[in-house]
Amino acid sequence: DEGSISVYNNGPGIHVEKTKNLSGTEMYTPQLIFGEFMAGSNFEDSQDRIVGGQNGIGSKLTVVFSKLFTVETLDSQSKQLYKQSFREGLTIIDPPTLESSGTKKPYTKISFIPDYVEFKLNVKTFLPTLRKLLETRTWQAAAYTSAKVYYNESIIPIKTFEDFCQMFT
């Protein structure tokens, strides 16, 4: 779909197991992560800890400000392929689908279509700017990680921050 964004990670996948949210409702872990606020463990401010992120708020806001948000993950432990979509800013939650993955390699793929109307953006005129922004952020990510980073299925040919800086000299 025009204006859709996907992020793919070939790591071990999200654990596909039943758990309970704060009110005791049973659901699968990916739904808890992406569809429930206050679902993490990083809320006790009196504890010393070293963590990244802001309690999952980035992923939750992405769901809330999307027309369509889909999580697809293949759990390396359970070998289950989990797919679920959240629509219209988390007002519609599709039931998850699960299937056995056999011998496929684990991964997680997040796809979403931002609610461009909510942001008062014309998708056709904004897309070139968005593409350039995402490409720039992808190059920056490649400069700071040891992972292979791709943009639109093309590998980013830098491995270090120094490689990134050389682009501007």
Task: Locate predicted features.
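GHKL-type ATPase core
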Residues: 3-27, 43-169
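ATPase catalytic-site recognition across NTP-hydrolyzing enzymes
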Residues: 31-32
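Conserved helix-loop functional segments at active or binding sites
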Residues: 35-44
